[in-house]
Amino acid sequence: MRRAPLFVVLGLLALALIVPVAGGELGFGSGNGAGASPSGVAAGASGQATLVPTTTSAATEGVAPSAPSAAPADPGSAPTPTSTPADPTPAPIAQLAEVPIVPVTQFRATVTNTTRKEVAAVLAGTSTRYEALELVAGEADAVLAALGVDRPSGLSHLVEAKDSATLSTDLAAHRKRLAFLRADAVGPSVRALAWGGDSLFGVDRVSALKDWPLNASLPVGDAASAFDPAATWTLFAGGDIMLDRGVAQALKVTGRGAAFPFSGGAADITSRYCCSPFGWKVPRLARAGDAGAVRKLISGADIALANFENPAPDHFTWHSKGTVFSADPALIDGIAKAGFDVMGIANNHIRDKGGPGLLQTVKNLKKRGLLTAGAGKDLTAARKPAVIEVGGVKVAILAYDAIAGSYHATATKIGSAPLAFKVVTADIKAARAAGADVVVVFPHWGVEYRGAAGAGQQRLARQVIDAGADMIIGNHAHWAAEMEIYKGKPIWYALGNLVFDQTWSEETMEGLTLELTFRGKGLAQVRMRPHAILDKAQPNFLDPAKDGKIVMDRVFKASPDLPW
């Protein structure tokens, strides 16, 4: 056998050592595979550089290397491409649309309208009514463009809030600010204003968005949250109506007729004189035009409600004085023709003509198309709500009395529904189970001739809200009284007189009406209108910035914790 020369053997041995090193299978770093860069950055499949973490060799740390978890890759195979994370999905671009925007100010404001000229004056610092214009930060430029005014430079009278909720809260703290909100962000804690005479809320609102003159290009959300005036509805609420005594005399003896009480318009207080039979100063009133405005408001509301504080039996007795009442059923015609829908009849006079007189009253009201709540042939009937559906929203009105216990119904007695917490709670639950979307509780309660609610009255009111009522509209005080917001729900303890002959004090000659606007199931706007009663029988609106201010101040003074 022939042996190879020594130099040939040495050459082959050297070649065997060199080739694996060149193939990358022998080294002191991590096995990055062919084509790896020493920096630990590999070319990914997309061609972009993607950071790949490197690993320190166990041998270099003085630790014996562990067995590989898999066989080494074939040095001749193609490298496995490094995966590159996908680019993050971009946020969807907000869709812009022409969105109705509404001028608003603080809840207690007496102003009802604003204009582009006034906005410009606010920004210029020349407005006598407002100190600043407040807008939502992300919407400010679009709103200013819609208003046709430029963004002020430098120190200005423009304030920007982070969102609509903050803006609404700001208006309560800074009562001399004008603001603009998208219509779908307007809530009851602010006062929505008309724009150049057009309104988006209330009885006189425009019927369609195409008729609203003020829109801004803003992001839109889902269609369900978009504002539609056709989906809004209104509720009118008034105080005590009594058709006996001086009222009957004013309507029948003088020949003014049943329609007279609701034919009023505006009135002014021209002076005050002394004195009434009780020794108090009372106002002298004069009509100031706009005849029929009261009827227009009542008839324009989708639901109109008041307290009917006397029986109207078939065989009535007119009383010239005293506190036992009964009314001519023919006078109900004026109530029905004014546009009322519901009469609350749970009060301390509804049984003044006994049980039969109460049932005849219910019959005479229903005969004229009026629903009743709060009294009936027995306790079950008395607790039955008046239910009205408006635009697919079912509204239940529950009425109760807390004054005349001897008039309360039982299982076998004709009478009124008692204002007892367990009764009200069960009735609210039953109304909800029957499909009510909105529940209004209408109690006759409290103390006469006092503006502030008593502690027990307030405690009960809060329990009723906790039980599921959406609002409480009370009466009996014969004064416009305290208002409270509890857990976002409004409570009016009393609205005062609407049609009554108590001309012996200013407080009993004045009252409030409510004009409430709802969006579906939710309350969107509140307007409280002060009025004074002329000729013992006819409410006429007072300007809340002038003569009506005394009524509004009386309410707000009695409401020290009102946040709006």
Predicted segments, located by residue:
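Short, flexible coil/linker elements and helix-boundary hinge sites characteristic
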Residues: 23-27, 47, 62, 148, ...
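N-terminal Sec-pathway targeting helices
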Residues: 1-12
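Ser/Thr-rich, Proline-interspersed low-complexity disordered segments
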Residues: 17, 31-95, 561
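Hydrophobic alpha-helical membrane-insertion segments, chiefly the h-region
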Residues: 11-26
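N-terminal non-cleavable signal-anchor helices
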Residues: 9-10, 22, 42, 53, ...
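Solvent-exposed helix-coil-helix hairpins and adjacent flexible coil/strand "hinge" segments
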Residues: 34, 180-185, 529-531
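Acidic, metal/ion-coordinating pockets
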Residues: 224-564
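Flexible loop/hinge segments at secondary-structure junctions
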Residues: 85-227
